Design a protein with these regions (language model features):
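Short beta-strand segments
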Residues: 25-60, 76-77, 86-90
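Short, basic/aromatic recognition patches
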Residues: 1-29
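C-terminal edge-of-domain segments
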Residues: 108-205
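Structural motif
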Residues: 52, 73, 103, 152-154
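Short helix-to-loop capping/linker segments positioned immediately adjacent to catalytic or ligand/cofactor-binding
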Residues: 29-34, 86-88, 104-109, 130-136
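A generic local secondary-structure boundary/capping motif
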Residues: 19, 65, 88-90, 135-138
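Hydrophobic/basic alpha-helical segments enriched in Actinobacteria
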Residues: 15, 20-26, 34-35, 52, ...
Length: 205
């Protein structure tokens, strides 16, 4: 892959801040290339754990999963803190963005599969954690989980007139390996990390 230097080098972000953008983002655009060379990008809800991004799909498959199985190279892009402004006679936009490159794979190991779905639910609907187990029992057989193992990541930020391009403020998520806002109800698993016991149908469910 050809790499180009960042034109505005002063806007580059360190790795931990780029990861924080991923954690704060509501969705990412995951891009592939069709078998005829046409680029294809699809917005997906996702969650990060460490250097891996997880998202789900149906077992029926579709455009993106056909591309995944043909070529596992993908790019995922996320943006937060977007705000247009006019200052000193110029129009501009504040933002924080992250671009990742990696390899996509289908998650087939049971523990990783379960934890990925729990983390996704806890990112987007943490208030419903006690219902996750039942939902997984119902929808799990019809669901596939995919993972992007990050090989490269870069970030870029343009502060607005207030000097702030931090998105929604969840920038501390990178410190705990992702899954922002999912600490409540966790129990540590020495193999696969932390997860809400109640969501898996264990004690307290």
């Amino acid at each position: 892959m050809t790499r180009f230097p960042l034109r505005r080098a002063e806007r580059a972000m360190p790795r931990d801040e780029a990861l924080a953008v991923l954690d704060a983002a509501e969705f990412a655009i995951v891009s592939t290339v069709d078998d005829d060379g046409m680029p294809y990008g699809v917005p997906l809800s996702f969650v990060r754990r460490g250097d891996t991004l997880y998202f789900h799909a149906t077992n029926e498959g579709g455009h993106k999963t056909v591309d995944f199985r043909r070529d596992d190279r993908v790019c995922a892009t996320a943006v937060t803190g977007v705000e247009a402004f006019f200052e000193d006679g110029d129009f501009s936009t504040s933002f924080r963005s992250a671009i990742t490159f990696g390899r996509v794979r289908e998650v087939v190991e049971a523990t990783e599969f379960k934890h990925a779905l729990v983390d996704l639910c806890m990112k987007y609907v943490p208030e419903a954690k006690r219902s996750i187990g039942k939902a997984m029992e119902k929808e799990g057989p019809h669901t596939s989980v995919w993972a992007i193992d990050i090989e490269e990541i870069s970030g870029k930020a343009h502060p607005g007139p207030r000097g702030d391009a931090s998105g929604d403020g969840r920038t501390d998520a990178a410190d705990d390996g992702g899954c922002a806002g999912t600490d409540a109800g966790r129990q540590t698993d020495p193999v696969a990390g932390a997860y809400p016991v109640a969501a898996l149908g264990g004690e307290g469910a």
